[in-house]
Amino acid sequence: MPVVETERHGQVLVVRMNRPERLNALNHEMRNRLAETWTEFRHSNELEVAIFTGTGRAFSAGYDLNSVAE
């Protein structure tokens, strides 16, 4: 299951953080994927709007400190 999912709707890019079991807390993989997605969006001539959302009941609980210890 990808930690970041994207959907395009015309000129709109929907970016969904997808770690609902951790309340979408960021880990290294998610941070990197979000950075890549943002770079792709910024350099796109076709996309005008980016919407960030989270899967499940939370947008994001912040950074997953347990993943830092691993």
Q: What are the functions of these language-model segments?
A:
Residues M1-T55, A61, A69:
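Conserved CoA-thioester-binding segment of acyl-CoA-metabolizing enzymes
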